[in-house]
């Protein structure tokens, strides 16, 4: 049975937290974020403020995360937000709204139970419950509100069983009380594990099926509502779903980030005593978390936040690869990591040192390209970037091609603007450089802002904090537009400010309490939600 759900009316919100400085912005940035206010849940470190959505109709913000489950915020006074209604539910992972309906999802009461979607009105009165797939992680409405799409991650359980991932399509055309659900699975013959693995889709377990191991994470809907694009983060892939036919069109591997390329690079060590971004002979699985979709110049584009995700039991430091192979022979192929093969970057001995690549976490399943038992390539987790993908092909046979990638901009800009936050840990301060050997800044949430005839991409950096921006009005040549952080990386507790940005959304000027477009940033670890005015300087 699902957890008991009740409605509670709350009249007072918690006090605002101390106000740390807003850092990172430069006067020369073409865009900036001006802080307007912050809601503090008073519940840090319990995922109480993960995802938020704005209802223009109710002029309220709906927030989900830890207890109580779903919160409605009255932000009429931006300096003093208050909770005016809650809905109690355990394990709520996502919330969405369209017109007069609020939708939320949560897992079953027991690990092997199916998940559930809750349909509520704007006052959080329950309208209907619908069973969906295992482990629903994210949901969103199609632009016209006729369908609700749910990504059911189906993560492995501690007992070793692996629940299948799926995508649920909920038909709302006859109203929420008459909603019907169709589950789209990944068990079609053309998506067998051998065929997908040959194309580059990552599967950590050789004996489990593709349907069990594919894990839907996040969804973007095309503007006409015909197709959904679903990230499969652990698999380093993205799936295209036909929403009318309720079927998987294709699954696309996303490839890697080449950190050895000119002008690229990363800081791979947390023990080198400094922030050092430079090219290294290593590739990064993109493994995006969130994804968005927009139309420009007659074409469709996807945008992905290439966060990365380590695989349980399949992550090892470079210096430990030889131990894992249980061999005295070097783990790295000398011919692949010689000075000549590495374009003079680093000798293999230096690569293995703790102030080189030695401490970087890599995927041992990848890199032995010739099958001789040593590694010809090193492949780590995460692209430390954001990327644009051009959608091509036809309606039933789509294609995607990477059109642009931000490369090492995230690490370089954070280092230049807020050096004490460089690759810091969101759960510890001060902690500069602590996440360098893992996945760096970990771009996670994103949103697209249409303002003043321009298109602004906002990306939250989960570990170091803050929001980085690009003007993508010309998707062929995005322009870095600015960075803003409300974190004090030298402080701890409430005075540290906003920690671990997760969900981002936009309040349009037409329904904004201040009459200007506002960016909402949910911060998972600090338990805070902050509002920023979005301003174009030129």
What are these regions (language model features)?
Residues 1-2, 6-8, 30, 342:
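Generic N-terminal initiation segments characterized by hydrophobic and/or small/turn-forming residues
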Residues 3-20:
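Bacterial Sec-dependent signal peptides at the C-terminal "C-region" and cleavage site
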Residues 17-538:
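Beta-sheet-rich non-transmembrane sensory/scaffold domains
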């Amino acid at each position: 049975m699902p957890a008991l759900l009740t409605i509670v009316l709350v009249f007072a919100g918690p006090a605002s937290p101390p106000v740390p400085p807003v850092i990172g912005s430069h006067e020369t940035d073409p865009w900036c974020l001006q802080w307007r206010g912050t809601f503090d849940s008073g519940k840090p470190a319990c995922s109480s403020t993960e995802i938020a959505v704005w209802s223009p109709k109710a002029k309220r913000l709906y927030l989900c995360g830890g207890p109580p489950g779903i919160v409605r915020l009255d932000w009429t006074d931006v300096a003093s937000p208050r909770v005016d209604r809650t809905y109690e539910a355990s394990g709520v992972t996502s919330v969405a709204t369209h017109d007069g309906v609020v939708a939320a999802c949560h897992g079953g009461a027991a690990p092997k139970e199916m998940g559930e979607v809750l349909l509520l009105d704007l006052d959080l009165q329950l309208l209907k419950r619908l069973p969906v797939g295992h482990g629903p992680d994210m949901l969103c409405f199609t632009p016209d509100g006729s369908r609700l799409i749910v990504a059911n991650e189906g993560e492995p359980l501690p007992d070793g069983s692996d629940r299948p991932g799926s995508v649920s399509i909920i038909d709302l055309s006859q109203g929420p009380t008459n909603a019907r659900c169709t589950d789209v699975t990944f068990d079609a013959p053309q998506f067998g594990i051998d065929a997908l693995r040959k194309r580059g889709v990552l599967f950590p377990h050789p004996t489990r099926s593709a349907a069990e191991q594919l894990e839907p994470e996040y969804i973007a809907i095309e503007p006409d509502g015909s197709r959904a694009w679903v990230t499969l983060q652990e698999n380093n892939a993205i799936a295209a779903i036909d929403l009318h036919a309720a079927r998987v069109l294709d699954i696309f591997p996303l490839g890697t980030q080449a950190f050895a390329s000119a002008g690229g690079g990363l800081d791979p060590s947390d023990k080198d005593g400094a922030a050092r971004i430079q090219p290294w002979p290593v590739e990064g699985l993109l493994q995006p978390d969130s994804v968005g979709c927009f139309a420009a110049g007659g074409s469709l584009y996807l945008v992905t936040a290439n966060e990365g995700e380590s695989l349980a039991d399949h992550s090892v430091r470079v210096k430990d690869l030889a131990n894992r192979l249980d061999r005295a022979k070097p783990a790295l192929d000398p011919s692949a990591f010689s000075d000549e093969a590495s374009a003079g970057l680093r000798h293999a001995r230096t690569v293995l040192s703790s102030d080189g690549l030695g401490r970087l976490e890599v995927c041992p399943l990848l890199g032995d390209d010739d099958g001789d038992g040593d590694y010809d390539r090193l492949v780590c987790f995460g692209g430390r970037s954001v990327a644009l993908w051009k959608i091509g092909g036809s309606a039933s046979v789509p294609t995607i091609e990477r059109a642009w990638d931000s490369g090492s901009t995230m690490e370089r800009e954070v280092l230049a603007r807020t050096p004490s936050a460089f690759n810091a840990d969101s759960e510890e301060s001060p902690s500069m450089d602590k996440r360098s050997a893992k996945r760096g800044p970990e771009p996670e949430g994103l949103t697209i802002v249409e303002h003043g005839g321009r298109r602004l991409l906002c990306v939250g950096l989960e570990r170091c904090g803050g929001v980085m921006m690009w003007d993508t009005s010309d998707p062929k040549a995005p322009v870095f537009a600015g960075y803003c952080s409300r974190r004090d990386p030298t402080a701890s507790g409430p005075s540290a400010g906003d920690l671990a940005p997760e969900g981002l959304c936009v309040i349009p000027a037409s329904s904004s309490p201040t009459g200007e477009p506002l960016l909402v940033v949910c911060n998972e670890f600090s338990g805070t939600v902050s509002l920023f005015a979005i301003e174009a300087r030129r």
